[in-house]
């Protein structure tokens, strides 16, 4: 996931020469502060904004155990919604296709200078590879950013899962709870 500083760097990057790319960047940042899956995100409308929060039922749980997810909107989300308040399309924000959205995310990351090296598994060989962050950024990076940064701030898995839509004790949720270097530093300093 990206840090809050990286998210802000992306959000503040001057993409005025590429207005369509700037729109997709804004959508990514919005997704990273509300945390929903891209499949749910594409279906959101202005009616999903209820009393200062994003409210929706996840597609993934709709058929067997539907739960309403309610994520209060922070100042970044409100800024983005204000920016697109005159958008008259059927969706909450002006999406392009998921494939083009993923490509736009990569371009926006690169133009914003989000180029740190990350280690990822090659899906074919299952061997670790080092890549630039902008090469591996996707819509799912937004969800990971939301969950990872939220967990880093509150360290309460139940509270975080209440806004991410995961069930309590979910195996899927555990993979988002990375213990980063800063958290390890805090941990060892408890012994000082």
Regions found by a protein language model. Give the residues of each.
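Basic, Lys/Arg- and aromatic-enriched nucleic-acid-binding interface segment
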Residues: 1-38, 42, 99-100
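DNA/chromatin major-groove-contacting recognition/catalytic segments
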Residues: 9-10, 69-83, 174-192
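Conserved helix-loop functional segments at active or binding sites
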Residues: 12-16, 47, 79, 114
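Short, basic (Lys/Arg/His-rich) helix/loop patches that form interaction surfaces
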Residues: 16-21, 86-91, 106-162, 166
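Exposed loop/turn and edge beta-strand positions of beta-sandwich/beta-sheet ligand-binding modules
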Residues: 24, 67, 75, 87, ...
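Conserved tyrosine-mediated DNA breakage-rejoining catalytic core shared by Y-recombinases
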Residues: 34, 43-82
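A short, basic/aromatic helix-end/turn motif that makes direct DNA contacts
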Residues: 43-49, 151-153, 161-168, 175-179
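Catalytic-site neighborhood detector that most strongly recognizes the C-terminal catalytic loop/helix
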Residues: 60-62, 98-101, 164-189
């Amino acid at each position: 996931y990206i840090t809050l500083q990286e998210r802000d760097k992306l959000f503040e990057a001057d993409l005025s020469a590429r207005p369509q790319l700037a729109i997709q960047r804004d959508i990514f940042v919005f997704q990273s502060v509300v945390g929903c899956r891209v499949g749910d995100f594409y279906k959101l409308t202005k009616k999903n904004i209820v009393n200062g929060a994003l409210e929706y039922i996840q597609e993934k749980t709709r058929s067997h155990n539907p739960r309403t997810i309610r994520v209060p909107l922070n100042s970044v989300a409100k800024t983005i919604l204000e920016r697109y308040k005159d958008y008259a399309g059927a969706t909450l924000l002006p999406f392009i296709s998921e494939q083009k959205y993923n490509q736009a995310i990569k371009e926006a990351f690169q133009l914003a200078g989000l180029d740190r090296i990350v280690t990822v598994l090659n899906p074919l060989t299952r061997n670790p590879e080092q890549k630039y962050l902008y090469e591996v950024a996707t819509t799912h990076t937004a969800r990971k950013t939301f969950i990872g940064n939220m967990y880093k701030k509150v360290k309460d898995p139940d509270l975080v899962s209440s806004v991410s839509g995961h069930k309590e004790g979910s195996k899927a949720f555990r993979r988002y709870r990375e213990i980063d270097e800063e958290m390890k530093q805090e941990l060892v300093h408890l012994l000082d």
